[in-house]
Each structure stands twice: as structure tokens, then as C-alpha cells.
């Protein structure tokens, strides 16, 4: 859902958005855990953004998926948005196991990323330190969940806020930036 919101932000405000790995539930062990959550608070947002969101059973960790996404980002940056969309659909539409290296490779099958590279990186957890470092940076900003948005390197906004909220925040930051520019 954050990606759908980000598309709207880009269209409305011509902003650049950088994505950083952040495990939603780092405490979930390999194999996943029973999921009793229905995410009912997110249903209206999913409907507004016209996206499908079915909670999976079990709820799986995302460590390997984040590592695979980092591989795609570095090996084929122009295809990373496609890969992230496929990860979303694998979890929330198709209920696939995004910790399975073969699933992660399959999601990139037609991308310009070597299958063997994704498989090796996620099997050996080679980029797990990068995922953890990203989470440490997010925690330093005060992030406690996803999505969290850092705007202009000045303000961290938690959660899936609506378009009007972001309109107000971005307009306020632009006013501050303009006032600071006038003071120079």
C-alpha cells in the first residue's frame, strides 16, 4: 500500500522517493507464525488505493525478501519497482512464501538479474547486515513500523497517511524552505 501511496505522492508533488529495507516483524522466525490478524483498519485504505490485500496464513518473515530486493536494486535499478510490486502481490494476493529462495528467484525470472545471484544472497543471508543497518537508521529517525516517510531529511511521518495529510506536510515544509531561502 505504501507504494501505491508513493505513486500518488510523486504525481501530486514531484518528489523523489527512496525505499529502504525495514522488516515489519523481525521477531517472526523462519517458517512464519500463525496469523490471526485481519488488518481490518487497512481495508478501507486498500479499497481507496484500489489494491488487493488478503492477509496470509502463516505470517512470514521478510528478511530474505528484503535481501532479494536489494540484489535487484543494485543489479537492475530500473526494475526494482517491478520487483517490489511482485513481492507485494506474492504476499497479499497470491499468499506465496517470500522466504523461499526459489519463489524470490521466480519473481525475478524475466528481470535482468542473475537467478544464481538472488539464490546465493538469500540462501547465505549475505545482505542481512544491510537490512539490519537500514532498520537501525529508521529507528534513529523514530520509525517503529512501516511505512515511515522521511521528508526532506527533516521530518519523519509514520503510517499510511492520506493524500491531504501529505499535501499539508509538504506545503508546510516548502513554506519553511522558502522562508529560510528569503533569510539568506
Q: Where are the regions that the model predicts?
A:
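Short, structured active-site "lid" loops
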Residues: 34-51
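Short glycine/proline- and acidic residue-enriched helix-loop micro-motifs
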Residues: 48-54, 116-121
